[in-house]
């Protein structure tokens, strides 16, 4: 079934082709099928149809316009001319025989360039002659026209401006005469064998005179103009026109104003060839008016990096025009570099944008608000077909006024940038060497650009560039929307004037003046649109009463604009009516001196005359916007490039890049969204290089700089983004109590920066290319995050295990930064990055880089060099162990830590709290960092370390066993403590095995450190599991029972499964469900998750498994370390059991640590007790140890001695000399009891291994655990044995 066209169009109108990309770039060329405001042709081909005796004027006008276009091309050639001599190769001595060939090649290259200069010479001669002839045509008495039209005056001035610029460029380009001298030298060499070279030599001499003579073009023009001495009148007319236009702001756009300013000093010199002509000129234009104009604009923009000075031009031309040298008042005007300091300061206040940025900002804000309001009214009007006519006219007229105001604003703003640049070029930085960026040597271009703009001036320039580009883009986007409104408004203005205003004048003021009435009638004839007085029948009022005049006031709106020829003719006719064509008429164009026209009518004519001038700019809408927003001149530096003798300046000297660099450095959130606008300057300069200057090499240089600059820009922008989000994350993760306790906590807060607009930029237009900035930033972010993780791991690998808390904190900050950034940017998942950096991508890889490093640190540094404090539950580094050699800590930018220096210091203060010990906080960090994937691998590595240590200790303990006597009995109470200690020393004959004793103690200490670490890890894991259980229990329907056990809250399925099943059934039953299989899959996944979480509720104990594993590892040495008694009863004299060895080691160790200046305890710590007591307990020797340990027996003897002494009243100093040792024994006994009590609680032998000794003394067989040293098995559930 076919869809009706109306419905199809309505459906298509609901689609939007616009994306969400913000407008942070300047206007771009658009392709549109709608009517645009640029459809008006700018030409004068239809002037002849109006029969106004303007055919001769129009012919000359077209000729001048052709010359102007040709002259601009000549100026482009001169401006972009670069020295060929610089590129000439220097022949070595060995190739001197090829000198002739080099001369020929050089001549051929230079001849091409010289041919262009000869073409410029010929063209300027022809153009000067044609301009002079055109001026003389208006000075002939037989001419039929009273004076040139305004359009003609502008064409004369534009051509004269082109000639002045050509002369200025020829004077400024030092490479041209240099190349010419080489050209002449090579010509002399290669033309020796040529015939008939006289003509070529004459041309060469003429070209040499032309190039070497300053102001040769102007002198030639002067000669051409005064071949007939009657052009003074037209020169005075031009001067009067310029002065009035400048004083009355008749020059609507800034390029026109600069043309007038550049031409005026030259015209003043040309118009004063004699005293009589000078007096005549000053009668029409007072000298003070000229001086004021020259003083108001001491520098005039001419080229991107060249400026003109009226005072300098007048002084220089006075040398060539002797009659003008008497004009002392004009010649005493100071040039820019001659200004007194006070005047220079005043001019600086005027020229520098930073002094006016507040007013400019207010203008921009006010205009954008009012323009948006006018656009809304226009869109409302377009959506309302039945709007009444008066309101339509008002809305469209208001839109026209806003466009005119926008053009004027753009003109003023762009002119400010031109003038500031010209002022900067005229006033180079004198103290460039004192700036921070300045090196030992710097070029002139660096003086006028790089070191000549302060930070505030750069900021103001960035703002103004943003205003120009944003307003230009706003005007460009609405081109097709406002076209009809602009054309209708212009049409209404013209028709109202010619049909109503002129009709009134014809009936009143000019009724009896036949000549003027004829002119007014001609104006009506060539411009009136009589068809506009009719309306469609359905719009005609029901009754039409009244006279013809009232009906003539209404015009049906038509988007038909006047042509350029009509505007040209209307301006001419108005001028004829007002001035009568009298060139010498005082009072200017619209002065009322001697005029018979009433003031009111004269004012109406003047107003419409000025409106006509702007009509052409409005009709040429896009071209006008392009001119007014073109800032490409900020890049060009041809003059300074030539004078500096370098191939190209570094990017740091480029003004567009300086603006980008300032935005990135300043971190001003208000300017950051404008960071792409300076790239529009590159777009403008590239367009100018290709279209205006037509030089591909300039475009290539711009492209190279843009490619290099954009890479730097993306890199630095990405770093700024990363730093901001890193600082934001670090600020949020700071302890609130820490911030509350500070008086200056605000320095840790981060001011918001708006990167969102840049994140949405998927189509950045640079040099005709479209770049996805969002994608580039995402790629850089992925790279920076990986580099940051790599740095954090490298940093951790160069520190000890205590730095794991800091590592976890820094990774948390980085992860939170990733979360914040992921809200605005699509980047790789953080878990993926972390796994990549940990080299843990494979599904069967469990030993991650971090786990390997932690185990390496434990094995090489932590276990040997850290000692345990059982009271604080912390390991601290032994001060008596030499520090382990580690690689130096890598340094990095603050952004790789916490973002800013202040935040780095704050987080470092927290990190230092955990840098001096290893304990529960560190294990929390390890559990979080390793996760459930790598933590079991680390646990297994620690268990294997216990097994390996036991294996290593076995021969050492055997050596100690061999040194003991075969039988060791109980200590006698008769000898007291002293006797006991003497007997113990005799029995423990290990004097020759001191090194062996130390190795055994260190081995037992490492075993104890591992076991204690496992105990702490068990505490941490239980807390983590409890927290996870509290989060998942409500979803699984689990609640605590009456006796503390976990029970299901309800029979059947868990709340999670029920929720997803009900949601699935509800969604699938809906007719709009397109993919029910996905919801069924989610429901099945919920059931699987329910089973997995419930199965994982009763996790085993790491400590219990460690003890069971250690017990299994001891099984193979049980026969050696715990020999069963031969009699079947407890043997109290055995000396080979482990508890005997450990008892001997312990009392020797206690003697050492209690000795004066001993540091043995700082080497072993409390881990020795955990290792020894655990082995004793698991061997079933706890009772033996408590009964027969040497230190325990000494304490018993000491207690008996103390009691006996108290009963017999003997010397209380009975234990003198043994107090320290006895106190150490008591502490050791308390620590041993604590260890045994913990072991009984976590690994009761009656449950797992049964009791090794009955009260009767009969031994029982042990339950053996299978030892799997080299393979990892799942931790056993609580209560199970293997």
UniProtKB/Swiss-Prot annotation:
Expression sites (tissue/organ): Expressed in roots, root hairs, hypocotyls, cotyledons, stems, leaves, trichomes and flowers.
Pfam families in the cross-refs: CYRIA-B_Rac1-bd, FragX_IP
InterPro entries listed in its UniProt record: CYRIA/CYRIB_Rac1-bd, Cytoplasmic_FMR1-int
An example molecular function term from Gene Ontology annotations: small GTPase binding
One Gene Ontology biological process: trichome morphogenesis
Gene Ontology, cellular component aspect: SCAR complex
Quaternary organization: Binds NAP1 and ROP2, but not ROP8.
Function: Involved in regulation of actin and microtubule organization. Part of a WAVE complex that activates the ARP2/3 complex. Interacts with the active form of RHO-family GTPases.
Designated name of the protein: Protein PIR
Species: Arabidopsis thaliana (Mouse-ear cress)
């Amino acid at each position: 079934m076919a869809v009706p066209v109306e419905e199809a169009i309505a459906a298509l109108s609901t689609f939007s082709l616009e994306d969400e990309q913000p407008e942070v770039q300047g206007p771009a060329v658009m392709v549109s099928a709608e009517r645009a405001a640029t459809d008006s042709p700018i030409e004068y081909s239809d002037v002849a149809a109006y029969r106004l005796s303007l055919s001769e004027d129009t012919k000359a006008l077209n000729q001048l316009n052709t010359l102007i276009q040709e002259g601009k091309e000549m100026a482009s050639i001169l401006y972009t001319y670069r020295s060929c001599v610089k590129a000439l190769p220097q022949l070595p001595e060995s190739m001197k025989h090829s000198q002739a060939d080099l001369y020929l090649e050089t001549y051929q290259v230079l001849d091409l360039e010289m041919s262009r200069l000869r073409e410029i010479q010929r063209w300027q001669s022809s153009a000067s002659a044609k301009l002079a002839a055109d001026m003389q045509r208006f000075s002939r008495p037989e001419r039929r026209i009273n004076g040139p039209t305004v359009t003609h005056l502008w064409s004369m001035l534009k051509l004269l401006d082109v000639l002045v610029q050509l002369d200025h460029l020829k004077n400024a380009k030092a490479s041209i005469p240099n190349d010419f001298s080489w050209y002449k030298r090579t010509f002399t060499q290669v033309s020796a064998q040529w015939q008939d070279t006289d003509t070529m030599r004459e041309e060469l001499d003429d070209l040499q005179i032309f190039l070497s003579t300053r102001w040769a073009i102007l002198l030639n023009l002067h000669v051409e103009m005064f071949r007939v001495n009657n052009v003074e009148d037209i020169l005075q007319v031009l001067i009067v026109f310029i002065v009035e236009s400048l004083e009355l702001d008749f020059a609507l756009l800034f390029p026109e104003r600069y043309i007038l300013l550049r031409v005026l000093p030259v015209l003043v010199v040309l118009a004063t060839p004699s005293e009589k002509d000078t007096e005549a000129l000053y009668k029409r234009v007072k000298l003070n008016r000229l001086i004021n104009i020259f003083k108001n604009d001491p520098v005039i923009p001419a080229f991107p990096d060249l400026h003109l000075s009226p005072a300098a031009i007048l002084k220089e031309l006075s040398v060539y025009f002797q009659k003008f040298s008497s004009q002392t008042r004009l010649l005493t005007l100071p040039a820019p570099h001659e200004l007194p300091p006070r005047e220079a300061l005043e001019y600086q206040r005027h020229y520098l944008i930073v002094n006016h940025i507040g007013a400019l900002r207010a203008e921009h804000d006010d205009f954008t608000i009012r323009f948006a309001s006018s656009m809304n009214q226009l869109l409302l009007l377009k959506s309302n077909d039945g709007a009444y006519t008066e309101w339509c006219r008002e809305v469209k007229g208001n839109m026209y006024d806003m466009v005119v105001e926008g053009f004027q604003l753009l003109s003023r703003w762009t002119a400010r940038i031109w003038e500031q640049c010209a002022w900067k070029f005229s006033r180079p930085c004198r103290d460039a060497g004192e700036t921070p960026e300045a090196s030992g040597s710097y070029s002139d271009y660096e003086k006028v650009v790089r070191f000549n703009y302060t930070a505030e001036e750069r900021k103001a320039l960035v703002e103004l560039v943003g205003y120009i580009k944003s307003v230009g883009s706003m005007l460009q986007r609405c081109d097709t929307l406002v076209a009809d409104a602009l054309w209708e408004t212009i049409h209404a203005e013209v028709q109202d004037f010619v049909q109503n205003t002129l009709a009134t004048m014809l009936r009143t003021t000019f009724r009896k003046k036949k000549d003027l009435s004829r002119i007014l009638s001609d104006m009506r004839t060539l411009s009136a649109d009589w068809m506009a007085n009719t309306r469609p029948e359905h719009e005609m009022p029901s009754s039409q009463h009244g006279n013809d005049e009232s009906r003539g006031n209404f015009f049906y709106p038509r988007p038909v604009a006047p042509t350029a020829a009509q505007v040209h003719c209307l301006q001419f006719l108005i001028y004829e009516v007002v001035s009568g064509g009298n060139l010498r008429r005082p009072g200017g164009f619209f002065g009322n001196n001697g005029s018979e026209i009433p003031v009111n009518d004269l004012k109406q004519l003047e107003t419409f005359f000025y409106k006509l001038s702007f009509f052409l700019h409005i009709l040429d809408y896009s071209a006008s916007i392009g001119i007014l927003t073109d800032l490409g001149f900020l890049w060009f530096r041809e003059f300074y490039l030539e004078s500096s003798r370098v191939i190209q300046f570094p990017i740091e000297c480029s003004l567009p890049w300086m603006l980008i660099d300032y935005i990135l450095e300043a971190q001003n959130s208000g300017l950051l969204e404008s960071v792409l606008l300076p790239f529009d300057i590159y777009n403008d300069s590239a367009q100018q290089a290709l279209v205006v200057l037509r030089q591909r090499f300039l475009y290539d240089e711009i492209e190279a700089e843009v490619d290099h600059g954009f890479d730097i820009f993306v890199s630095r922008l990405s770093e700024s983004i990363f730093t901001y989000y890193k600082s934001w994350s670090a600020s949020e993760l700071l302890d609130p109590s820490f911030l509350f306790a500070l008086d200056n906590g605000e320095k840790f807060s981060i001011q918001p920066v708006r990167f969102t607009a840049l994140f949405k930029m998927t189509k950045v237009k640079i040099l005709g290319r479209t770049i996805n900035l969002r994608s580039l930033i995402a790629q850089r972010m992925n790279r920076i995050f990986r580099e940051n993780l790599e740095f954090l791991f490298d940093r951790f690998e160069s520190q000890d295990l205590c730095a794991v808390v800091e590592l976890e904190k820094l990774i948390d900050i980085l992860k939170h930064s990733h979360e914040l950034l992921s809200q605005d940017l699509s980047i790789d998942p953080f878990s993926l990055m972390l796994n990549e950096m940990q080299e843990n991508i494979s599904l069967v890889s469990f030993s991650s880089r971090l786990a390997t490093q932690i185990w390496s640190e434990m094995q090489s540094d932590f276990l040997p060099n850290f000692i345990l404090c059982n009271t604080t539950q912390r390991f601290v580094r032994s001060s008596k162990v030499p520090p382990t050699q580690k690689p130096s800590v890598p340094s990095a930018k603050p952004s790789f830590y916490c973002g800013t220096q202040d935040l780095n210091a704050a987080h470092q203060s927290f990190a230092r709290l955990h840098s001096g010990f290893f304990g529960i906080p560190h294990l929390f960090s390890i559990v979080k960092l390793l996760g459930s994937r790598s933590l079991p691998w680390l646990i297994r590595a620690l268990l294997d370390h216990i097994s390996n240590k036991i294996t290593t200790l076995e021969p050492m303990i055997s050596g100690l066993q061999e040194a003991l006597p075969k039988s060791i009995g109980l200590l006698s109470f008769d000898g007291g403590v002293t006797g006991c200690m003497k007997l113990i020393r005799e029995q423990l004959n290990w004097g020759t095995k001191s090194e062996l004793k130390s190795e055994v103690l260190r081995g037992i200490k490492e075993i104890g450190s591992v076991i204690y670490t496992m105990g702490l890890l068990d505490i941490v894991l239980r807390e983590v599991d409890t927290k996870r259980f509290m989060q998942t229990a409500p979803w699984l329907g689990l609640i605590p029972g009456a006796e503390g056990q976990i029970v299901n809250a309800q029979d059947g399925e868990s709340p999670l499964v029920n929720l997803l099943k009900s949601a699935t059934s509800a969604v699938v039953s809906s007719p709009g469900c397109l993919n029910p299989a996905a919801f069924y899959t989610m429901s099945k996944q919920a059931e699987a998750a329910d089973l997995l979480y419930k199965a994982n509720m009763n996790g085993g104990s790491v400590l219990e498994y460690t003890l069971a594993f250690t017990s299994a590892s001891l099984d193979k040495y049980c026969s050696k370390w715990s020999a069963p008694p031969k009699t079947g009863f407890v043997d109290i004299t055995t000396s080979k059991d482990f508890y005997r060895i450990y008892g001997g080691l312990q009392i020797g160790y206690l003697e050492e640590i209690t000795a004066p200046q001993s540091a043995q305890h700082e080497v072993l710590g409390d881990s020795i007790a955990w290792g020894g007591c655990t082995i004793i307990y698991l061997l079933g020797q706890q009772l033996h140890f408590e009964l027969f340990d040497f230190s325990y027996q000494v304490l018993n003897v000491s207690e008996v001695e103390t009691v006996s002494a108290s009963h017999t009243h003997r010397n209380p100093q009975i234990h003198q000399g043994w107090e320290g040792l006895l106190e150490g024994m008591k502490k050791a006994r308390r620590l041993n009891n604590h260890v045994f009590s913990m072991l009984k609680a976590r690994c009761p032998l009656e449950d797992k291994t049964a009791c090794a000794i009955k009260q009767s003394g009969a031994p029982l067989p042990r339950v053996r655990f299978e030892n799997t040293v080299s393979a990892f098995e799942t931790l056993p559930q609580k209560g199970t044995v293997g």
